[in-house]
Amino acid sequence: MATINDNYLKLKAGYLFPEIARRVNAFAEANPDAKIIRLGIGDVTEPLPAACRSAMIQAVEEMGDRSSFKGYGPEQGYAWLREKIATQDFQARGADVDAAEIFISDGSKCDTGNILDIFGDNNIIAVTDPVYPVYVDTNVMAGHTGAANEKGEFEGLVYLPVTAENNFTAEIPSQKVDLIYLCFPNNPTGATATKEHLQAWVDYAKAHNSIIFFDAAYESYITDPSLPHSIYEIEGAREVAIEFRSFSKNAGFTGTRCALTVVPKTLKAKAADGSDVELWKLWNRRQSTKFNGVSYIVQRGAEAVYSEAGQAQVKALVSFYLDNAKIIREKLTAAGLSVYGGVNAPYVWVKTPNGLSSWDFFDQLLQTVNVVGTPGSGFGAAGEGYFRVSAFNSRENVEEAMKRITEKFKL
């Protein structure tokens, strides 16, 4: 009989968001008249920018003409998109990133998991707690951990608590770690990192020959000019960091699928024989073997983000969600709840009232006011007693949800 990858059996019963969906669906079936407002999973609600739609429509027409039809594209992405990303997203901010170091993909979630393909099994891996569950679960699947304890922490991972006491920014570990996951603006807490904070991480990584996985999926929500958008704005980062970005949350591509990963050609790691190997070459080989590239139509849509009209439309879209976050933050604060994030980030991190556990608060919100959020404990043990509220919804729904919550849970 064929055998399985037993590492999957170590995973907790359900990935966080499917478990939320299961509970919501069960409630909806039992209460078909309930008007449920979903502020849980970070999926966008507003239409694609007009510039992106127009570019994609034009690309579809091109695919209908033999002279302009496109078949397989380059696995790394089309040069015209990579050049615009390098110029406008990185070089314009003083970050030294070349177009050849950018790999276009169908999602940063995929890339943060797939990147493990090019790393060995004996690395010491550090994650923040709470953390985006994909970072942990993909390492479990890859066999990089032992079993989970009663708190859900996996043996073999180094957990770096982020709490109100440290402003939800992890402290540099006292021990040596090899791979470090950082996400700023942070999912789920909405925390941001200063240049000084990221410089400390880069210095640590250089001193210990570590690699930082920097998830910048929400960088477009940064409005404070003093905050870095890319880790490559930090001196020395090209020697220690891989950055992941996405078009999902700035241009609404959650259903369209386009993202990018930056692997500097100066970034190296050790082979078993002790030699230094360029990670760019390994990632390029991995993508060329396992990935056929993002569709031409979608990449033309992503390219339109960098047009004058596209930039204005994306800015308006991000501002819309930031205004939602401001409403959530202000209303919940006025109700007496302890609230974090929601500034320079689309997520608001809320302390649950009256000592409720994260899942108990989830159930109460769902059952009493028909509002869905995300239990903090689903992001890790240190998230227990917290709750994530997403700004990704219509203005009408956000205002109605806040009205319901504040009337029910005002302290």
UniProtKB/Swiss-Prot annotation:
So where does pyridoxal 5'-phosphate get bound? Y72, S108, K109, Y132, N187, Y218, S246, F247, S248, R257, N292
Q: Which residues carry this modification: N6-(pyridoxal phosphate)lysine?
A: K249
InterPro entries, from UniProt?
Aminotransferase_I/II_large, DapL/ALD1, PyrdxlP-dep_Trfase, PyrdxlP-dep_Trfase_major, PyrdxlP-dep_Trfase_small
Q: What is its EC number?
A: 2.6.1.83
Reaction catalysed by this enzyme: (2S,6S)-2,6-diaminopimelate + 2-oxoglutarate = (S)-2,3,4,5-tetrahydrodipicolinate + L-glutamate + H2O + H(+)
Q: In which pathway does it act?
A: Amino-acid biosynthesis; L-lysine biosynthesis via DAP pathway; LL-2,6-diaminopimelate from (S)-tetrahydrodipicolinate (aminotransferase route): step 1/1
Q: Which domain of life is it from?
A: Bacteria
Identify its protein family. Belongs to the class-I pyridoxal-phosphate-dependent aminotransferase family. LL-diaminopimelate aminotransferase subfamily.
Q: How does it assemble?
A: Homodimer.
Record protein name field: LL-diaminopimelate aminotransferase 1
